[in-house]
From Swiss-Prot:
The species this protein was found in: Neurospora crassa (strain ATCC 24698 / 74-OR23-1A / CBS 708.71 / DSM 1257 / FGSC 987)
Protein name: 30 kDa heat shock protein
Gene3D superfamilies per record: 2.60.40.790
Presence of keyword Transmembrane helix: no
GO cellular component: cytoplasm
Miscellaneous note of the record: The N-terminal putative helical domain may be the site through which HSP30 binding to mitochondrial membrane is regulated.
Bias (Low complexity) ranges: 144-158
Disulphide linkage map: none
Disulfide bond keyword on record: no
Sequence ranges assigned to domain sHSP in this UniProt record: 49-228
Amino acid sequence: MALFPRGFYGSYGSDPSFTNLFRLLDDFDTYTREVQGSAPETGSRRHTQPTRTFSPKFDVRETEQTYELHGELPGIDRDNVQIEFTDPQTIVIRGRVERNYTAGTPPAQVAGVLTEKGEPHSPAAHHATVEDDVDEDNRSVATTATGANNQNNQQVAQRASAPTTEEKPKAPAEKYWVSERSIGEFSRTFNFPGRVDQNAVSASLNNGILTITVPKAKKHETIRIAIN
């Protein structure tokens, strides 16, 4: 990813040293990103989700007294952006964009009520057994098999109605069907061709645009000291 836009090279076209420096840094940055992206995942890294990265777009503008950087950072909070100087003429802008979302899938249709063993439950699966019993007058009457059968039926009904210990997590009420916005970590590095005043740098984030103003350092002036 270019450290400066291609148009920025043109402002220093008369000085080949600056142009070569920018192109060298640009090529090195591109090579580093390609190596990191093509590195094979081994060991425990295979089971971890790689960190998503993206590169926000910046405009770099030079005035007579300052350098101005304007970057697109929509939907990011200012507390998640860090700006620092790694050396007197290099500024690094990094941060992170986080959004919680769940990939959506069409809801599955339930074919029927399942029992604890996962088999279809049918009302006809349980029948009360009866047998003929003869009373003292030799009359045949229909009675239930035993009182134990009733107790067993009640226990089965209680187990069927009781919630299972292993319950699947409930699906979220809201889902994202499409996620196209950039999320993850980002980092941009800019190297200025001249000395800058780090103590006077200002930054603001309004309407998704990060604006950084870097004043140029005052030129060193020769001071003559008179001898008394």
